[in-house]
């Protein structure tokens, strides 16, 4: 329906510094990869218009700094998010171990209405590197995702554009579902309680 309003979807991309968050965003939005990206300071965002199930939506992708000293910026950037993407480097076990704390950090800062059902997507990035350098297996990553409520999982390469489109397609769809559920529940935010007292001694006229 063309009369339906355009939807803005806010997607937060989290993960340790150097896992490729900025590269994934740039590959998805600009179809470009650069090996000389500087570390993100604070936060930055890119937008891309996409069609999700015949619905025109604008994806607003927020790339937040992975350094701990910038985590205090969280509240302003996380609030109003429709989906959170957790990124780690399959060749770096520390970045994988940090996923839990990034997820917890998001839930605390964003305070979603229904935290148990808030949509996350996990991306294991840099699969283009030599197999011998890989330290996190697909099985281990999937076990983690299943333990957190079957979070969708993709293995990606921003450099080679592997699974980037596919991953963001799922991210967009899940974000849209979240946005629509928030919209629906927002209609019933303040229920009206009607209490009728039956005055037996009063006039019935």
Swiss-Prot record:
GO cellular component, one term: plasma membrane
Entry keyword Electron transport: no
Subcellular compartments: Cell membrane
Molecular function as annotated in GO: GTP binding; GTPase activity
Covalent lipidation (S-geranylgeranyl cysteine), chain numbering: 203, 205
Chief location bin: membrane
Function: Ypt/Rab-type GTPases are key regulators of membrane trafficking and intracellular vesicular transport. They act as molecular switches that convert between GTP-bound and GDP-bound states, and regulate virtually all steps of membrane traffic from the formation of the transport vesicle at the donor membrane to its fusion at the target membrane. In the GDP-bound state, Ypt proteins are predominantly cytosolic, solubilized through the interaction with a GDP dissociation inhibitor (GDI).
Ligand binding (GTP): 17-23, 33-40, 66, 125-128, 157-159
Gene Ontology process terms (BP): protein transport; regulation of vacuole fusion, non-autophagic
Name of protein: Ypt/Rab-type GTPase Rab7
Membrane topology, as annotated: Lipid-anchor
Lineage: Eukaryota, Fungi, Dikarya, Ascomycota, Pezizomycotina
Coiled coil: none
Keywords: Cell membrane, GTP-binding, Lipoprotein, Membrane, Methylation, Nucleotide-binding, Prenylation, Protein transport, Transport
Motif (Effector region): 37-45
Cell cycle among keywords: no
Family: Belongs to the small GTPase superfamily. Rab family.
